[in-house]
C-alpha cells in the first residue's frame, strides 16, 4: 500500500549529478566551478570553534544579511538567506502558489523547476525560446493569459548562456501579473563592463525577486548557501512564515 500523495507517486524526482569518488575525473555534469574557493574560506573553516556546534545557529542569518545588504546597496529586510538557491525556489512556490495554480518558465530551463512544481501539484506553462535562444517578445503576455502565479527566468540563461537585457527584465517585471523570480545563479560570470546589475529594480516593482548563490562563482557548492533579494513584501512572509526554523547551519553562516 502506498501512502504517497497521488502527484508524488507519479513524480520521477530530480536527478542529481553523480559525484564520482575519483578526483581525477573531469566533472562537468552539474556546472561546479573547477577552481577552489578563495584561500580565506579554508582559513575560516580551519579556525572554526567546534564547541559552538552545541547551539542552534542564528535563525535568520542576520550577520550575513547585513553584510549582503551593504554590498548590494539594499535593505537587510530585502534579503533572505537560504540553503542554496534551491531552497529559495521551494519557498517561492510554497509561499505564493496554491496547488493547481500554474507556474511559468521558458523552454529549455533549469530542470528542477518542473519537479518542484509537481511536488506542489502545480502545472507548468512553458514558452519556447526563439531559435537564437532569445526571449519571445510576447512571453509575459502569454504568462498572464495562462494565469501564471510565479514566473521563473534564469538569467544568464541556463543551459544556453544567453543574457537577457536589463530592459527585458524591467519589461517582465512591469508586465507580468505574477511574482517574478530572476534566477541569477550564473550572474558572477557576466562581464562587469556590461553594467547589467538589475537589483535596484526591487525598489520599483513589488513582484520581483532575484536569486543568488555562492555555489557557482564562489566555488562553494558544498556549503549549500544562497540568498534572495527582493521587495520586502515578498521577502517577509518567506523569512517569517515558510522558512525552516534553522535553515542554515552555523559553519556556512
Task: For every predicted segment, state its role.
Residues 1-55, 147:
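N-terminal "arm"/small-domain region of PLP-dependent enzymes with the aminotransferase-like
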Residues 62-102, 120:
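Phosphate-binding glycine-rich loop
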Residues 84-99, 180-182, 186-191, 201:
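Glycine/small-residue-rich loop that forms an oxyanion/phosphate-binding "nest" at active or ligand-binding sites
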Residues 95-153:
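PLP-dependent aminotransferase-like
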Residues 101, 122, 176-179, 183-184, ...:
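A short helix->loop->beta-strand "cap" motif at the edges of active sites that frequently abuts
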Residues 131-190:
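Active-site phosphate-binding strand-loop segment of PLP-dependent enzymes
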Residues 207-253:
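PLP-dependent aminotransferase class I/II
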